[in-house]
């Protein structure tokens, strides 16, 4: 550039600052990028209280079903009246909600002979003695004690007001001569220690029955007849925790006289508080 002097214009040069300014801008952008990355990692590594990391959702409550064990016998003239009471209760609540078992046993039970089908069993007699049954018909609802059939409706109504601390799912299959499958126990409320009991019952058995009028009906249709205890008379110990599922496998042989399409598996969990939940499922053909 030219600067005026008294001797005339004087040519001078000035060094440009452009490269330095560009370097400063680049360093500034780089520094901002590094700071941003540091802030991002800082935010990601922020400590979160354990209680705020995952929100636990309690399993939904399910309704409780009721187990009604009817200590009955083919030579019991009042037992058909008790069976009719069960029919009325199941019509009101359904047979899947009020699950009945006809426990043929005791002095009025009948083991059968060469000509006549008997439905009493050794296991049934053992349960009869275990519960100290005094007369027939007499029932045990949810393993809470004995009761007369005239009281069953009221007891069932009260038991159905409860919720179950666990859910039971049954997978039962049959090849015609035996049954097998699995039981899934899902904990819903607290930790549960108890016994899992598995029974096989049979519907629609035509056999002798003494009637209230003193006659003998040889074509009486017996329902939910106890056949066998799959896993022992007392069942097996289980421990089910809330939010977890426990699975138990089972297998059992069928007697030649049983009709597979009429068979049901009943599964229930009980402890000193009685039956906590009960379910039933038909055996499905493989």
Question: For the regions a protein language model found, what residue spans apply to each?
Answer:
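Local sequence-structure signature of Cys/Sec-based thiol-disulfide redox active-site neighborhoods
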Residues: 58-103
């Amino acid at each position: 550039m030219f600067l005026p002097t008294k001797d005339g214009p004087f040519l001078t040069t000035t060094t440009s600052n452009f490269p330095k300014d560009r370097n400063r801008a680049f360093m500034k952008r780089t520094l901002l990028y590094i700071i941003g990355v540091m802030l991002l990692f800082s935010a990601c590594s922020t400590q979160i209280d354990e209680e705020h990391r995952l929100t636990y959702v309690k399993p939904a409550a399910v309704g409780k079903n009721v187990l009604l064990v009817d200590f009955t016998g083919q030579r019991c003239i009042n037992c058909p009246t008790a069976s009719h009471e069960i029919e009325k209760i199941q019509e009101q609540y359904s047979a899947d909600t009020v699950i009945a078992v006809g426990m043929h046993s005791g002095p009025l039970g009948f083991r059968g002979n060469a000509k006549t089908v008997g439905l009493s069993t050794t296991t049934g007699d053992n349960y009869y003695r275990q519960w100290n049954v005094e007369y027939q018909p007499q029932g045990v609802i949810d393993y809470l004690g004995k009761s007369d059939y005239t009281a069953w409706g009221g007891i069932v109504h009260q038991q159905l007001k409860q919720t179950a601390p666990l859910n039971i799912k049954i997978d039962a299959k049959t090849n015609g001569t035996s049954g097998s499958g699995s039981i899934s126990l899902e904990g819903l409320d607290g930790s549960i220690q108890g016994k899992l009991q598995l029974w096989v019952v049979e519907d629609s058995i035509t056999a002798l029955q003494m009637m209230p009028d003193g006659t003998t009906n040889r074509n009486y249709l017996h329902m939910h007849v106890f056949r066998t205890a799959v896993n022992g008379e007392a069942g097996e110990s289980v421990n089910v925790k809330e939010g977890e599922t426990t699975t138990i496998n089972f297998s059992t042989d069928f007697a030649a006289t049983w009709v597979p399409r009429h068979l049901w598996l009943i599964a229930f969990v009980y402890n000193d508080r009685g039956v906590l939940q009960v379910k039933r499922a038909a055996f499905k053909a493989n």
